[in-house]
């Protein structure tokens, strides 16, 4: 019997969290003698679906993985792709996302199917409590969310809105979990006429990379007085 073959599909290779997941997987694979392949979908749900299906549909069984572990890019956890994998006897693991089809696919009894995730709503609540502690008298929070179609981003925003006090006002921007995407979003926001009179008391982001991107965008402001106003 040969080594287990595992395919991991991650969203992007320019996000610290995704890179750390890849590093952890490589270390575990080396430790346990697993043949590991990692692919990235460049934050494109169609690309991710196509990449995984191509592997599932390999003619030779030896070219197919024994298991697929993936973090979904889009709003769904690729139910049709999941079914195709399980029908081929390939184990299916969803990272950081709920997937309502899991009980049904488990019932087929053809391959293991499960989810590894965290409580994203609770993460949003905790962040709301942190913001409230930092701004006990209230204020304006520049809040950088993940992609609109991403359920983790939606759940974190839901938790934030549930728990934040009424005296905290959120100014919402959208990113793609990366420094560059957050930087672009803030650059565009700073160009708006309405932004000139805006006062920000706190910056909050749904991941560390986007928080860094926000700061970098403020550091680019050419006017020293304005730059210090945003950074102070």
Whereabouts are the PLM-identified features?
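A residue-level marker of the well-folded mature domains of exported/periplasmic proteins
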Residues: 1-232
């Amino acid at each position: 019997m040969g080594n287990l073959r595992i395919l991991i599909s991650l969203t992007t290779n320019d996000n610290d969290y995704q890179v750390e997941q890849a590093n952890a997987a490589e270390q575990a694979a080396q430790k346990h003698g697993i043949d590991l392949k990692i692919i990235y979908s460049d934050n494109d749900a169609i690309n991710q679906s196509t990449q995984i299906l191509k592997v599932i549909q390999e003619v030779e069984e030896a070219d197919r993985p024994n298991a697929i572990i993936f973090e979904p890019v889009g709003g769904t956890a690729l139910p049709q792709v999941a079914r195709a994998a399980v029908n081929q006897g390939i184990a299916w693991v969803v990272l950081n996302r709920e997937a309502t089809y899991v009980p049904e696919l488990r019932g087929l009894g053809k391959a293991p199917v499960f989810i590894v995730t965290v409580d994203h709503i609770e993460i949003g609540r905790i962040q709301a409590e942190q913001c409230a502690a930092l701004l006990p008298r209230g204020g304006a929070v520049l809040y950088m969310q993940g992609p609109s179609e991403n359920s983790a981003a939606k759940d974190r925003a839901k938790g934030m809105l549930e728990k934040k006090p009424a005296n905290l006002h959120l100014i919402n921007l959208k990113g793609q979990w990366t420094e560059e995407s957050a930087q672009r979003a803030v650059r565009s926001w700073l160009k708006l006429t309405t932004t000139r009179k805006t006062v920000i008391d706190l910056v909050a982001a749904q991941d560390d990379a986007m928080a860094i991107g926000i700061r970098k965008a403020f550091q680019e402001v050419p006017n020293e007085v304005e730059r210090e106003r945003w950074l102070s």
